Amino acid sequence: MGKEPDNINMKKAITDPEILSTIAKLITKSISEDNIDKVAGPALGAVPIATAVSLESEIPLLMIRKEKKGYGTSKLIEGELNEGDDVIVVEDVTTTGGSLLKAIKAIQDNGGSVKRAFVVVDRQEGAIEAFDSEGVKLEPLITVDEFF
Protein backbone atom coordinates (compact mmCIF):
# COMPACT_ATOMS: atom_id res chain seq x y z
CA MET A 1 0.00 0.00 0.00
CA GLY A 2 1.34 3.42 -0.95
CA LYS A 3 1.17 6.51 1.21
CA GLU A 4 -2.30 7.92 1.08
CA PRO A 5 -2.79 11.68 0.99
CA ASP A 6 -4.43 13.50 3.88
CA ASN A 7 -6.90 15.02 1.44
CA ILE A 8 -8.34 13.32 -1.63
CA ASN A 9 -9.27 15.98 -4.19
CA MET A 10 -12.05 14.59 -6.35
CA LYS A 11 -12.81 17.92 -8.05
CA LYS A 12 -10.80 17.02 -11.16
CA ALA A 13 -12.62 13.69 -11.46
CA ILE A 14 -16.09 15.11 -10.87
CA THR A 15 -15.61 17.86 -13.45
CA ASP A 16 -14.39 15.48 -16.18
CA PRO A 17 -17.26 14.33 -18.46
CA GLU A 18 -15.65 10.98 -19.28
CA ILE A 19 -15.02 10.08 -15.63
CA LEU A 20 -18.50 11.28 -14.61
CA SER A 21 -20.03 9.17 -17.37
CA THR A 22 -18.14 6.08 -16.18
CA ILE A 23 -19.21 6.68 -12.56
CA ALA A 24 -22.84 7.19 -13.65
CA LYS A 25 -22.83 3.99 -15.72
CA LEU A 26 -21.40 1.94 -12.82
CA ILE A 27 -23.99 3.22 -10.36
CA THR A 28 -26.88 2.95 -12.83
CA LYS A 29 -25.95 -0.66 -13.60
CA SER A 30 -25.89 -1.43 -9.88
CA ILE A 31 -29.39 0.00 -9.30
CA SER A 32 -31.02 -1.28 -12.49
CA GLU A 33 -32.94 -4.01 -10.62
CA ASP A 34 -34.12 -1.63 -7.89
CA ASN A 35 -37.22 0.53 -7.96
CA ILE A 36 -35.57 3.88 -7.26
CA ASP A 37 -37.62 7.08 -7.34
CA LYS A 38 -34.88 9.70 -6.84
CA VAL A 39 -31.10 10.15 -6.98
CA ALA A 40 -29.72 12.55 -4.37
CA GLY A 41 -26.39 14.20 -3.73
CA PRO A 42 -25.28 16.62 -1.04
CA ALA A 43 -23.81 19.94 -2.17
CA LEU A 44 -21.26 20.56 -3.53
CA GLY A 45 -19.07 17.61 -4.50
CA ALA A 46 -21.82 15.08 -5.07
CA VAL A 47 -24.09 17.23 -7.23
CA PRO A 48 -22.22 16.53 -10.51
CA ILE A 49 -22.23 12.80 -9.69
CA ALA A 50 -25.94 12.78 -8.81
CA THR A 51 -26.71 14.78 -11.97
CA ALA A 52 -24.73 12.33 -14.13
CA VAL A 53 -26.52 9.35 -12.54
CA SER A 54 -29.88 11.09 -13.00
CA LEU A 55 -29.17 11.66 -16.70
CA GLU A 56 -27.87 8.10 -17.25
CA SER A 57 -30.69 6.39 -15.34
CA GLU A 58 -33.48 8.86 -16.16
CA ILE A 59 -34.30 9.00 -12.43
CA PRO A 60 -35.17 12.49 -11.11
CA LEU A 61 -32.55 14.41 -9.13
CA LEU A 62 -32.52 15.81 -5.60
CA MET A 63 -29.85 18.18 -4.29
CA ILE A 64 -29.29 18.34 -0.55
CA ARG A 65 -27.96 21.58 0.91
CA LYS A 66 -25.69 21.56 3.94
CA GLU A 67 -28.10 24.01 5.57
CA LYS A 68 -31.21 25.98 4.67
CA LYS A 69 -30.56 29.28 2.94
CA GLY A 70 -31.99 32.45 4.43
CA TYR A 71 -33.30 33.55 1.04
CA GLY A 72 -35.09 32.13 -2.00
CA THR A 73 -37.04 28.96 -1.28
CA SER A 74 -34.97 28.32 1.89
CA LYS A 75 -35.31 24.57 1.30
CA LEU A 76 -32.82 21.99 2.53
CA ILE A 77 -33.77 19.68 -0.35
CA GLU A 78 -34.04 20.97 -3.92
CA GLY A 79 -36.17 18.84 -6.21
CA GLU A 80 -39.45 17.03 -5.63
CA LEU A 81 -39.32 14.48 -2.81
CA ASN A 82 -42.60 12.67 -2.23
CA GLU A 83 -43.65 10.72 0.85
CA GLY A 84 -42.40 7.14 0.49
CA ASP A 85 -39.92 7.81 -2.33
CA ASP A 86 -37.03 5.34 -2.47
CA VAL A 87 -33.86 7.39 -2.84
CA ILE A 88 -30.24 6.46 -3.52
CA VAL A 89 -27.63 8.89 -2.31
CA VAL A 90 -24.23 9.48 -3.93
CA GLU A 91 -21.05 11.13 -2.68
CA ASP A 92 -17.54 11.75 -4.00
CA VAL A 93 -15.48 10.81 -0.90
CA THR A 94 -16.39 9.47 2.55
CA THR A 95 -14.24 9.45 5.65
CA THR A 96 -16.49 8.84 8.65
CA GLY A 97 -19.67 9.32 6.60
CA GLY A 98 -21.01 12.07 8.85
CA SER A 99 -21.95 14.60 6.18
CA LEU A 100 -23.61 11.99 3.97
CA LEU A 101 -25.55 10.57 6.94
CA LYS A 102 -26.77 14.13 7.64
CA ALA A 103 -28.07 14.34 4.04
CA ILE A 104 -29.77 10.95 4.43
CA LYS A 105 -31.43 12.12 7.64
CA ALA A 106 -32.79 15.18 5.80
CA ILE A 107 -34.30 12.87 3.17
CA GLN A 108 -35.80 10.59 5.82
CA ASP A 109 -37.14 13.55 7.81
CA ASN A 110 -38.95 14.70 4.65
CA GLY A 111 -40.62 11.35 3.91
CA GLY A 112 -38.02 9.60 1.76
CA SER A 113 -36.45 6.20 2.32
CA VAL A 114 -32.73 5.51 1.79
CA LYS A 115 -31.40 1.95 1.81
CA ARG A 116 -28.33 2.33 -0.42
CA ALA A 117 -25.64 4.96 -0.83
CA PHE A 118 -22.75 5.06 -3.28
CA VAL A 119 -19.40 6.76 -2.86
CA VAL A 120 -16.66 7.06 -5.46
CA VAL A 121 -13.82 6.72 -2.91
CA ASP A 122 -14.14 5.47 0.67
CA ARG A 123 -11.21 6.48 2.88
CA GLN A 124 -11.86 3.43 5.10
CA GLU A 125 -12.15 5.43 8.30
CA GLY A 126 -15.47 4.09 9.59
CA ALA A 127 -18.09 5.22 7.08
CA ILE A 128 -19.25 1.73 6.06
CA GLU A 129 -19.74 0.73 9.70
CA ALA A 130 -21.55 3.99 10.49
CA PHE A 131 -23.94 3.38 7.59
CA ASP A 132 -24.50 -0.25 8.61
CA SER A 133 -25.59 0.93 12.07
CA GLU A 134 -28.15 3.22 10.38
CA GLY A 135 -29.51 0.45 8.14
CA VAL A 136 -28.05 1.93 4.94
CA LYS A 137 -25.67 -0.01 2.71
CA LEU A 138 -22.69 2.15 1.67
CA GLU A 139 -21.19 0.90 -1.58
CA PRO A 140 -17.80 2.38 -2.53
CA LEU A 141 -16.74 2.19 -6.17
CA ILE A 142 -13.16 2.03 -4.86
CA THR A 143 -11.44 2.25 -1.49
CA VAL A 144 -8.48 4.44 -0.67
CA ASP A 145 -6.28 1.31 -0.50
CA GLU A 146 -7.22 0.44 -4.09
CA PHE A 147 -6.71 4.04 -5.21
CA PHE A 148 -3.25 4.67 -3.72
Regions found by a protein language model. Name each.
Residues 1-35:
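Active-site-facing substrate-recognition patch
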Residues 7, 51-88, 96-101:
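Short, glycine/charge-rich flexible loops or terminal/linker lids adjacent to PRPP-binding catalytic cores
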Residues 32-37, 82-85:
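Short helix-loop-beta connector
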Residues 34-45, 118:
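Short glycine-rich phosphate-binding loop at a beta-alpha junction
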Residues 39-40, 62, 115, 139:
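Structural detector of well-ordered beta-strand residues that form the stable sheet scaffold
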Residues 105-148:
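PRPP-dependent phosphoribosyltransferase catalytic core
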